[in-house]
Amino acid sequence: QDSRPCEERFGCTRYVDTSIPHIPVTAHGLKENGYATIATTNWLPYSWSINNVAFAEVMHTALSYFQAGRAEAGYKLLKSSVLDGMYLGDSPGNFGQISFYDAARGECYRDFGDPIGVASRVLIQGLFGILPDALNQQIILRPGFPDDWDKASVSTPDISYRFTRKEDTDTY
């Protein structure tokens, strides 16, 4: 677990909000909902490996939002990245390494595996909040569901749970 105070984690994500380029995720027929992916840096000049739109880095940033207590922002970035790579890209249903929004490379490396691991982590640890603590032989639940969700469920080999929200009561 991150030992930094929540305020510091929040501040780090605010840096992303204010200083890292946000690129709108748009498509014909996609309802405008403020979806956006991000570049890895704001450094110039733009060059390969300096300012990419890389799925693994975007997913790590989404996880950072969840870890900072900013579930809505984490979910929005997660969903934006899923839309970008799995629906709008040239290889539907796949996470490649680089988004087609990347100015230098465009969509490439469709069989690159590192985004899959971190996408799984942001889904399980960020959205569903399943945080294993092996040293203490426990699993901590700290879900990051969006405010407008009224139900969700997850099942892994180690844990399964259901979530429901009715008015002001969340039940797990």
What are these regions (language model features)?
Residues 148-172:
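Carbohydrate-binding surface patches
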Residues 101-105, 146-151:
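Short amphipathic alpha-helical patches
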Residues 1-122, 126-132:
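Active-site core of glycosidic bond-cleaving carbohydrate-active enzymes
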